[in-house]
């Protein structure tokens, strides 16, 4: 994976078509109850290119979906953590929201599989714990209920199907107030 001038991860269009189609097929047909041929047809990407990106395993494709959720949706990569440190919450949340807009089944995948007793479910629950740790690192004085409030606000913002960039701005301002009040590490710039 390469990064552009702003440090955003760049994956080509074929990667996203395959990932989006695999997540949709898995959600609609059931866990791993689809074929690579169906995936190729749906994504309009050749099987050889699918194998190049993901290998021959359907599970490896879904694991890549979990990786994307961790890095891009939850923001566990270095660049996104740095954005939080710089007080750029709106930018970080907007990137997560835009990903959900481009990958409409990502939310369903996450919500459906997070408690499944399999490798995907376990990985998603692990990402939740990592996000809780990230919030705790930035807001060390918050108790568990307050961290859950930040978590639910964050995921509500990015998963809400009727959100707009304008509504995101209002929600992010709320989170910025929480961070400015409780975080010794971050001094976000609040707009009036």
Regions found by a protein language model. Give the residues of each.
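N-terminal intrinsically disordered/low-complexity leader segments
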Residues: 1-13, 188-192
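N-terminal positioning helix adjacent to the helix-turn-helix/winged-helix DNA-binding module
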Residues: 7-21, 146
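Short, well-structured alpha-helical segments
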Residues: 16, 90, 94, 143-155
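Helix-turn-helix
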Residues: 17, 25-60
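Alpha-helical DNA-contacting segments of helix-turn-helix folds
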Residues: 61-69, 123
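Hydrophobic alpha-helical connector segments
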Residues: 77-102, 150
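Amphipathic alpha-helical packing segments from all-alpha helical-bundle domains
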Residues: 78, 114-148, 170-180
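Amphipathic alpha-helical segments used for helix-helix packing
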Residues: 94-122, 159-160
